[in-house]
Design a protein with these regions (language model features):
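C-terminal helical cap(s) of enzyme catalytic domains, especially alpha/beta-barrels
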Residues: 1, 21-27, 117-127, 133-152
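Conserved anion-binding
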Residues: 1-79
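Catalytic cores of alpha/beta
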Residues: 1-4, 19-20, 88-123, 143
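Glycine-rich beta-to-alpha transition loops that act as phosphate-gripper elements at the mouths
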Residues: 13-14, 36-38, 84, 99-111, ...
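Conserved active-site and cofactor/substrate-binding residues in soluble primary-metabolism enzymes
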Residues: 15, 19, 54, 58, ...
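Short, well-ordered secondary-structure micro-motifs
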Residues: 20-22, 44-47, 82-85, 113-115, ...
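Conserved, mostly hydrophobic/aromatic
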Residues: 34, 71, 93, 116, ...
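Short, small-residue-enriched loops and turns at beta-alpha junctions
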Residues: 42, 78-83, 109, 135
C-alpha cells in the first residue's frame, strides 16, 4: 500500500486469521476490503473448496467492526452461471453490516446491472462483471452508462 495500491482484498484470511484483517484495517484505514464467498449463506474458504461453518452475515458484521472499507460478496451458486445477481442477498448483507458491498457472480445482462443499481440506497456499491463481458452478453460501455446514471 505504501507503493500506491488503492485497495487490498483479503479472502480466506477473514475466516482463518481475522486478527490479520483487524491489524491491516488499523494500519491502512479505508484501504482494506474483504471477499466473502458464500453458498446458501455459509462462507466458503480455500478457493471455495471448504465450507467454514461461518454465516456470511456474521462475518460481514465482524469485518465491519474491524473497519473494512468494502466487502466483495460472491454468491458461489451464481458465479459464472449467467443466472442473475443475487441482489436481495447482497442488499441484505449491506444493510446488516453497514459496509458498502460489491456484488459478484451471476451478471448475465444489462438488466442485472440495473437491478443491482436499485439497491444502491441499501449499500450495494456495484457489481463485478466477468463472463458476461467475455461472451458479449454485456457491452462494457453500456454497463458503465447504467452504473454512472443518477437515481431517478
Amino acid at each position: 500500500l505504501e507503493l500506491g495500491v488503492e485497495r487490498l482484498i483479503l479472502g480466506s484470511a477473514a475466516v482463518k486469521n481475522p486478527e490479520l484483517v483487524k491489524e491491516a484495517c488499523a494500519k491502512y484505514p479505508g484501504h482494506i476490503a474483504v471477499g466473502i464467498d458464500a453458498k446458501n449463506g455459509d462462507v466458503a474458504i480455500e478457493g471455495w473448496g471448504e465450507g467454514s461453518g461461518v454465516a456470511a452475515t456474521e462475518l460481514a458484521k465482524k469485518m465491519a467492526d474491524y473497519g473494512v472499507a468494502t466487502i466483495i460478496f460472491t454468491d458461489i451458486s451464481r458465479d459464472g452461471m449467467l443466472s442473475g445477481v443475487n441482489s436481495e442477498a447482497t442488499a441484505a448483507l449491506a444493510r446488516a453490516c453497514g459496509v458498502p458491498i460489491i456484488a459478484s457472480g451471476g451478471v448475465a445482462s444489462l438488466d442485472d446491472i440495473r437491478n443491482v443499481k436499485k439497491y444502491e440506497k441499501d449499500g450495494v456499491a456495484g457489481c463485478i462483471i466477468g463472463k458476461a463481458i467475455y461472451t458479449g452478453a454485456v457491452n462494457l460501455p453500456d454497463a458503465l452508462k447504467i452504473a454512472a446514471a443518477k437515481e431517478e
